[in-house]
């Protein structure tokens, strides 16, 4: 039976609404007779702003409330920043499609007094704002002379904190800045040899219920096959390492012909240990490439690093 009304669950943050409204517009364009509504809500991660994300210790900080709406029949799909979506989903839900990825890189954003500097030339003791353990660990490894300070809030709030002098610079996702119209604030795109990006960064994941083939059919117009292959490899890598959103795991994925190559990294929080390797394989089976790379890093000690972090978090 054809679906007449599609309900979308979304976070209510400004970035989330920009992303969800884009999905809504694209679906309306593809399915002119379909009525589409958005149910926006705050998630646990949106409500807890005075505690570092890593200390909250929940893999579904930005997704559980949206998933609950689908599980009780109040929404057919949910739109997520794919990097926020755990690799293991609740029973009855699935990752229906992945949109074309925007720039997945991390970006350096500075205030006016630091406009002359790049990440490499920032003076010793400069205060770098980031809420990501992945960015923190990699930057500590490469730039131990810098100071790192947690920063929470939406993108606009973070930029206000930067411009008021609380930080010398911020590290943010380039895609989020561009989607919100702040692309001109990107001072430097941080290369992958310094900071590998998060799993799924720059792409949107559309989660849906498993037993609604008519919903799956509707949203496939948004699926981008090359991005999907990249992100499936990355998510398989993360799943084997048993890492959530708040662990120092980074990736980069490239496709050449019928081959996909995944680079992956695990680092200690103090930045003193960093394990990095790569794995290539057939594009037809991207998840196998992700799993193989995860086992390769585990053989080099990545599991021990992650176990130390998990034990540290449990003790807090």
UniProtKB/Swiss-Prot annotation:
Please give the coiled-coil regions recorded for this protein. none
Catalytically driven reaction(s):
4 porphobilinogen + H2O = hydroxymethylbilane + 4 NH4(+)
Pathway it acts in? Porphyrin-containing compound metabolism; protoporphyrin-IX biosynthesis; coproporphyrinogen-III from 5-aminolevulinate: step 2/4; Porphyrin-containing compound metabolism; chlorophyll biosynthesis
Task: Establish whether keyword Transferase is in the entry.
Answer: yes
This protein's GO cellular component annotations are: cytoplasm
| EC category | transferase
Its required cofactor(s), as named, are: dipyrromethane
Q: What are the recorded GO MF terms, alphabetically? A: hydroxymethylbilane synthase activity
GO process annotations (BP): chlorophyll biosynthetic process; protoporphyrinogen IX biosynthetic process
Tell me how the cofactor is bound: Binds 1 dipyrromethane group covalently.
One short Pfam family name for this protein? Answer: Porphobil_deamC
Q: Where is the signal peptide?
A: none
What PROSITE patterns does the record point to? PORPHOBILINOGEN_DEAM
> Which keywords does the record carry?
Chlorophyll biosynthesis, Porphyrin biosynthesis, Transferase
**Superkingdom classification of source:** Bacteria
S-(dipyrrolylmethanemethyl)cysteine occurs at which residues? 245
Q: Which Gene3D superfamilies match?
A: Periplasmic binding protein-like II, Porphobilinogen deaminase, C-terminal domain
Give the EC number(s) listed in the UniProt record: 2.5.1.61
The family note in this entry says: Belongs to the HMBS family.
Other information: The porphobilinogen subunits are added to the dipyrromethane group.
Q: What does this protein do?
A: Tetrapolymerization of the monopyrrole PBG into the hydroxymethylbilane pre-uroporphyrinogen in several discrete steps.
Q: How does it assemble?
A: Monomer.
Name of the protein in question:
Porphobilinogen deaminase
User: Which species?
Assistant: Synechococcus sp. (strain CC9311)
């Amino acid at each position: 039976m054809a679906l007449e009304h599609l309900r979308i669950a979304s976070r209510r943050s400004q970035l989330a609404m920009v992303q969800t409204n884009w999905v809504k517009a694209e679906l309306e364009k593809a399915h002119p007779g379909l009525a589409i509504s958005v149910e926006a809500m705050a998630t646990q991660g949106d409500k807890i702003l005075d505690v570092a994300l890593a200390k909250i210790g929940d893999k579904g900080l930005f997704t559980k409330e949206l998933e609950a709406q689908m599980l009780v029949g109040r929404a057919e799909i949910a739109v997520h920043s794919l990097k926020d979506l755990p690799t293991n989903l609740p029973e009855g839900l699935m990752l229906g499609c992945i949109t074309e990825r925007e720039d997945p890189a991390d970006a350096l954003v500075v205030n006016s007094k630091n406009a002359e500097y790049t990440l490499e030339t920032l003076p010793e003791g400069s205060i770098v704002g980031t809420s990501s353990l992945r960015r923190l660990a990699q930057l500590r490894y490469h730039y131990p002379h810098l100071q790192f300070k947690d920063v929470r809030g939406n993108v606009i709030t973070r930029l206000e904190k930067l411009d008021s002098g609380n930080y010398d610079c911020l590290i943010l996702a380039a895609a989020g800045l561009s989607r919100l119209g702040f692309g001109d604030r990107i001072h430097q795109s941080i290369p992958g040899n310094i900071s590998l990006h998060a799993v799924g960064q720059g792409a949107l994941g559309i989660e849906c219920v498993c037993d609604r083939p008519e919903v799956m059919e509707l949203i496939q117009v948004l699926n981008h096959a090359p991005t999907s292959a990249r992100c499936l490899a990355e998510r398989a890598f993360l799943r084997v390492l048993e890492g959530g959103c708040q662990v120092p795991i980074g990736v980069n994925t490239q496709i050449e012909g019928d081959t996909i190559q995944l680079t992956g990294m695990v680092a200690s929080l103090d930045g003193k240990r960093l394990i990095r390797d790569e794995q290539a394989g057939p594009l037809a089976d991207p998840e196998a490439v992700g799993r193989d790379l995860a086992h390769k890093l585990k053989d080099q000690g990545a599991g021990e690093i992650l176990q130390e972090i998990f034990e540290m978090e449990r003790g807090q």
